[in-house]
Amino acid sequence: MKKTMKMLATALLLSAICLSACEKPSLAEETNTEEQETKDLFHLSFRVAQFEHIPFNQAIDMSRATDVKQVCTRISLALFKDGVKVKNIHQDTKDAHFGKIDVTLPAGTYQVVAIAHSGSGSATITSPEEISFPKNKMTDTFYYSQEVTVGGNASYQLEMKRAVAMFRLVTTDAIPTAVKTMKFYYTGGSSTFNAMTGVGAKNSRQTEERTVTDAQHAGPGQFDVYTFPHTPSDVLKITVSALNASGDVITEHTFEEVPVKVNEITQYKGSFFQGTTPADANVFSFSVQDEWTKKEYAY
């Protein structure tokens, strides 16, 4: 009996040694696989360095190589492979390296989409053809869209193109103190962007409100709103309402067939509050401006 137990113990010991020996190559294989996967990843650096067109804001230095912090407060970058989003990064001006985004990716061909804007939240890049913004509210917006082939470490300097057209209302008369808000309701443009075509992706009904400042009550007012035209040139129908604190309309004007163009300011300038009644006939001037280009129209 003792001899049998001794033989059994010896057999178990030999089995354990064999199992241990068999497992070692498996562990080595896993380690080699991990090392191989790491070696197959490449470091890519994207720097938002230039803007093809200068900003609408004339207070900013007019240069085609404007610092991103002077133009926008948010950047979103997404990479797609075979139509599937594989990377999605958002930055704002609180980030120490705002304007510089680093990623690691395996070899392959990718569609890169970058959006720079100053909205209340990050842009949603659902696909290169569908980019939207929080509450469909728009600001001056720039984009980059390019296919890249990854086969090694690389750096990319992104030259951003302006994506929007601007409508600017200039009132030459003082705004009544009862007016607290200027409301813009407009159709004909889009609040969703297609980075592959560089134009609007959907037919949108856009509403923007601008608070009237004390300075504007004392003199002329200027109000800017944006849209993505469906073609490089498009037309809008815009209704502008002056509202009191309760949201009641004090006076209102509708502008038909307003021409808009990407990277262009369409400016309507005139006396908006003549008699502060909607029945008054006002004449507005019209103009337009590049880099921003501007065209002005009288109303």
Give a label for each model feature.
Residues Q36-F46, F56-D61, K161-A165, S233:
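Short coil/turn motif common to extracellular beta-sandwich-like domains
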Residues L41-S45, S76, Q111-V113, S155-Q157, ...:
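Beta-strand secondary-structure signal
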Residues R47-Q70, V170-A178:
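Structural motif
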Residues S132-A163, R168-T172, H253-Y299:
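Extracellular beta-sheet/turn segments enriched in Thr/Pro/Gly and aliphatic residues
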Residues R162-M166, D173-T177, Y186-S191:
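Short loop/turn and low-complexity linker motifs enriched in small/turn-promoting residues
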